[in-house]
Amino acid sequence: MPPATDPEIPAVTAPQKNKYLCLTILGYKKEGMTEEAYRNHMLNVSAPMTKDLMVKYGIRRWTMIHNQTPTRALMTQLFDSQMVNLAPYDCFSQVVFESIEDYKKIKLDPWYRKYLVGDHENFADTKRSEMTIGWIEEFVRDGQLVEGFEGEYV
């Protein structure tokens, strides 16, 4: 697989019609923090501080998926010859936007820099957490077939 800076891979900066980027943060909780304290901080401290900023800069959707011990245990019911590896992350946070510029504006916002950057150190293991970004492709929404992320029902 070519590196992300490969000259054969075109740069993506402008919004694509009916296409949305999804930044996925594969998060680990801060060492010594319980699962419940981590989830509580993200839901009741971090999210309230972040969501208005996301709206301000045109973010389309932001979700968190907390992978606590009881839900991870459910995976034993799904394991088979192909699904055998349980992801070790404590949370997946997904941010959906039209252009990379939308998210870059958040990171440049003075309020973000003053309050949110420091808050991450209160609950997240920022040295172990990982990120990736890609296009969202949606096929089923609310039990209905769809064409594209915000496309028409088929």
UniProtKB/Swiss-Prot annotation:
Catalyses: atrochrysone carboxylate + H(+) = atrochrysone + CO2
Which Gene3D superfamilies does the record cross-reference, listed alphabetically?
3.30.70.100
Disulfide bond positions: none
Q: Does the keyword Lyase apply?
A: yes
Entry's InterPro entries?
Answer: Dimeric_a/b-barrel, EthD_dom
Which superkingdom is the protein from? Eukaryota
Where exactly are the transmembrane stretches of this chain? none
This protein's UniProt keywords: Lyase
Q: In which pathway does it act?
A: Secondary metabolite biosynthesis
Keyword Lyase: yes or no?
A: yes
Q: List, in alphabetical order, the Gene Ontology terms for molecular function in this entry.
A: lyase activity; oxidoreductase activity
Signals that turn on the gene: Expression is positively regulated by the cluster-specific transcription factor MYCFIDRAFT_198930 and is up-regulated during banana leaves infection.
Tell me its EC number(s), please: 4.1.1.-
Record's Pfam families?
EthD (PF07110)
Provide the function of this protein.
Decarboxylase; part of the gene cluster that mediates the biosynthesis of an emodin derivative that may be involved in black Sigatoka disease of banana. The pathway begins with the synthesis of atrochrysone thioester by the polyketide synthase PKS8-1. The atrochrysone carboxyl ACP thioesterase MYCFIDRAFT_190111 then breaks the thioester bond and releases the atrochrysone carboxylic acid from PKS8-1.
So what family is this one in? Answer: Belongs to the tpcK family.
Q: What is this protein called?
A: Decarboxylase MYCFIDRAFT_34057
